[in-house]
A protein has these predicted regions:
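Short, highly charged C-terminal tails/helix-capping segments
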Residues: 82-106
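Short, internal acidic amphipathic alpha-helical interface segments
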Residues: 6-43
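Surface-exposed beta-strand edges and their flanking turn/coil or helix-capping segments
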Residues: 4-6, 15-18, 50, 58-61
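Alpha-helix initiation and N-capping motif
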Residues: 16, 78, 91-92
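N-terminal accessory segment detector
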Residues: 1-4, 10-11, 106
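Charged, low-complexity intrinsically disordered regions
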Residues: 35-88
Length: 106
């Protein structure tokens, strides 16, 4: 199974280097799947592969967990790409803004 999630935002040429730095930093933080830049369109993507050999089929629980992981990871780091592409922030600032955790309740 190969799943690709496209972030429908084109990376301007003047932000490409910083987006590549961000992609490397994010990939160092995650264990499953990876972010990449779709070279034809210059768009950030998240890619996930699941190798199933010998006719194996994932259970509903496994597939739902896979989709939840993909969704959670994309939702967590999509703002980082926005901070860099449109906000003009550097990769370090963007990561800090995306991985903070809140304390307490409102």
């Amino acid at each position: 199974i190969h799943i690709i999630v496209f972030f429908e935002t084109k990376i301007p040429e003047y932000r490409q280097d910083e987006v590549y730095k961000l992609t490397i930093k994010i990939n160092q933080l995650i264990w499953l799947g990876h972010f990449d830049i779709w070279s034809d369109e210059l768009m950030p993507v998240f890619r996930y592969n699941l190798l199933l050999s010998g006719g194996l089929i994932p259970t509903d629980i496994q597939f739902n967990s896979l989709l939840r992981h993909i969704t959670d990871t994309c939702e967590k780091f999509f703002p980082s790409f926005q901070y860099v592409i449109w906000g003009g922030n550097n990769a370090d600032e963007a990561i800090k803004n995306s991985i903070f955790t809140t304390a307490g309740e409102s």
